[in-house]
Regions:
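Internal acidic/polar
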Residues: 2-7, 12-16, 97, 104-133, ...
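Short, charged helix-capping/linker segments at alpha-helix termini
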Residues: 8-13, 27-36, 46-65, 158, ...
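Conserved RNAP core-binding helix
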Residues: 18, 39-42, 46, 56-73, ...
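Short amphipathic alpha-helical boundary/capping segments
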Residues: 21-26, 130-139
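Short helix-capping/turn signature of helix-turn-helix
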Residues: 40-43, 51-54, 137, 147-154
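Structural recognition of an alpha-helix C-terminal capping motif at a helix-to-coil junction
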Residues: 47, 61-68, 72, 81-93, ...
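Arg/Lys-rich amphipathic alpha helix in sigma70-family domain 2
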Residues: 72-79, 88-109
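DNA-recognition helix of helix-turn-helix
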Residues: 92, 96, 142, 151, ...
Length: 190
């Protein structure tokens, strides 16, 4: 179970060059490139939005805002950085703006958790319930770091830059989170 969070098997590997090309085409007004970017990155964007907003409906709504923002601002992307990092920074900034506006931090309800399509994470209902419990045992920032690494396949250095945290902090929080999750899962299995 925990090994699922330590791989990127369920998230497509970031192909930096192809994503850069898509962003350049989007900057030129290519709607097909936007559709392709959406297909390649939607799981990662949704996962990040859900980790901030903790509400499936709000995360889906914000996800649409992200791609509208990408369409409007694609010409601002500079191909020196990670295209996925740029996209997730857009998502993060929109999440933070929404949270500031709404000032709410509700827990992910069981109904909202179940709204996540099963095929997106490759788990059956029992495994999803265990994973939900393990993730709920984490602090918000720990959960966000684990999900960014597991869902998007981002490297810890990229997560540190995205969350504006020192790399050693991200690494320690990630490893502490995995220990907490392992402890939670071993407690349930006993």
């Amino acid at each position: 179970m925990l090994s699922l969070l330590m791989t990127t098997e369920y998230a497509p590997a970031e192909d930096r060059h192809e994503l850069q090309q898509l962003l350049l085409h989007i900057a030129g007004g290519d709607r097909d490139a936007l559709a392709e970017l959406y297909q390649r990155t939607r799981v990662a964007v949704y996962g990040l939005a859900l980790s901030y907003l903790k509400n499936a409906h709000d995360a889906q709504d914000l996800m649409q805002d992200v791609y509208v923002q990408v369409w409007d601002c694609a010409e601002q992307y500079r191909p020196i950085g990670s295209p996925m990092g740029w996209l997730l920074t857009v998502c993060r900034n929109l999440c933070l703006m929404r949270l500031r506006r709404e000032e709410r931090h509700a827990a992910l309800s069981e109904e909202e958790w179940n709204a996540i399509p099963a095929q997106e994470c490759g788990l059956d209902a029992d495994e999803r319930a265990l994973l939900q419990g393990a993730l709920a045992s984490l602090a918000d920032e720990e959960r966000r770091i684990v999900l960014l690494h597991a869902v998007t396949g981002m490297k810890h250095r990229e997560i540190a830059a995205l969350l504006e945290l020192p790399l050693p902090t991200v690494l320690s929080k990630y490893h502490r989170a995995l220990k907490k999750m392992r402890s939670f899962l071993e407690g349930d299995d006993a």
